[in-house]
């Protein structure tokens, strides 16, 4: 049994065997991400990172997740999620309660129209980024 925690500061790893591991000290530092990858390596492409992230400004980069589909659920605010598919940009406008699936390997970014929060369920293995 777990005590309540704030998902915006304690992310959760979903792994094989229907496990859910809270990550109270999660960090986007390279050192932490390398340790995270090693710790959950046995989950392979089935592992997912669940996080609640503020959407305060348009992203300054693009990312893609070759290991699987990413679910993005906008809880508040207004965001245009932009996917690059076959060299074309596809804009998916999102409002509160709306969701989108980023297919495996599809580059995506976000343009924030009204600040809010989004819930991400991400297959992190092999994630790549590039400048916006």
Feature locations, PLM:
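Double-stranded beta-helix
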Residues: 1-15, 109-132
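Short acidic-glycine-tyrosine-enriched beta hairpin
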Residues: 86-104
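Short, conserved beta-strand element in jelly-roll/cupin
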Residues: 66-81, 121
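Short histidine-centered beta-strand/loop micro-motifs
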Residues: 39-41, 59-66, 83-84, 91-92, ...
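A short, N-terminal "cap"/entry segment at the start of jelly-roll beta-barrel domains
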Residues: 1-62
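Short, surface-exposed beta-edge/turn micro-motifs
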Residues: 47, 68-71, 116
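A generic "binding-loop/recognition-motif" signal
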Residues: 67, 106, 114
């Amino acid at each position: 049994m777990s005590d309540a925690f704030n998902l915006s500061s304690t992310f959760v790893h979903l792994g094989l065997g229907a496990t859910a591991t809270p990550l109270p000290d999660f960090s986007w530092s390279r050192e932490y991400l390398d340790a995270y990858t090693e710790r959950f390596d046995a989950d392979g492409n089935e592992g997912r990172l669940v996080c609640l992230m503020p959407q305060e400004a348009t992203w300054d980069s693009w990312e893609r997740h070759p290991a699987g589909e990413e679910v993005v659920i906008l809880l508040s605010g207004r965001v245009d999620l932009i996917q690059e598919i076959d060299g074309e940009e596809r804009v998916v406008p999102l409002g509160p309660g709306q969701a989108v699936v980023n297919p495996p390997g599809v580059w995506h970014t976000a343009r924030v129209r009204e600040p809010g929060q989004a819930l991400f369920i991400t297959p992190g293995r092999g994630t790549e980024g590039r400048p916006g």
